[in-house]
Amino acid sequence: MLTKDELDYLSKIPENKKVSIKPFDLEGKKIGESIVQKIRNYLPDLEVLFMGSVALKIAGQKDIDIYALANPKDFNKYLPTFEKLFGVPAKQGKYVKKTFIEWKFKKNGYEVEVYLTEPPERQIRVFEILKSNKKLLKEYEDLKLSFDGKSYKDYQKAKYEFYNNILDA
């Protein structure tokens, strides 16, 4: 069963959008780790997580996901540093400055997304489960690879279903 937020996100994906899955590449992991370190150098008390397929060392969309965790009421305290490091936030929608602020940029062929966000508990749990269970991690990578060149909406839906299944187990 998909959540309301998952269904909402899926409804916004164009029908003709395709997904491209690439093999894991150590360079992406190094880029992610360097961005995390850069944030920690400026904000040593902020919890920063590197999650997603690159952090898990599996095939993925060649994107890097970094999460800096903070209470939304403290976002203004951190915003000047993040803008200094990453420029103007990319996400200017209804969520900005409420539950997350997002920066997007490219680095050495990787799409990088940096979030100043309240802790995404479900996402963190899924990441920790996959990191600690090699069998599930392999199933997840196989799922991702099976969607290469196919519908992004179907891919995202399958990932959500996979997440919900492992969270319910």
Feature annotation, model-predicted:
Residues 1-49, 160-163:
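Helical scaffold of the NTase/Pol beta-like nucleotidyltransferase catalytic core
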Residues 4, 117-169:
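Catalytic cores of NTP-dependent nucleotidyl/adenyl transfer enzymes across multiple folds
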Residues 12-14, 58-61, 106:
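Short, flexible turn/loop "capping" segments at secondary-structure junctions
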Residues 20-26, 67, 126-129:
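Short histidine-centered catalytic/ligand-binding loop motif
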Residues 36-64, 68-74:
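Active-site nucleotide-donor binding segment shared across nucleotidyl transfer reactions
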Residues 77-86:
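Short amphipathic alpha-helices in soluble, non-transmembrane regions
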Residues 86-120:
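Conserved catalytic core of two-metal-ion nucleotidyltransferases
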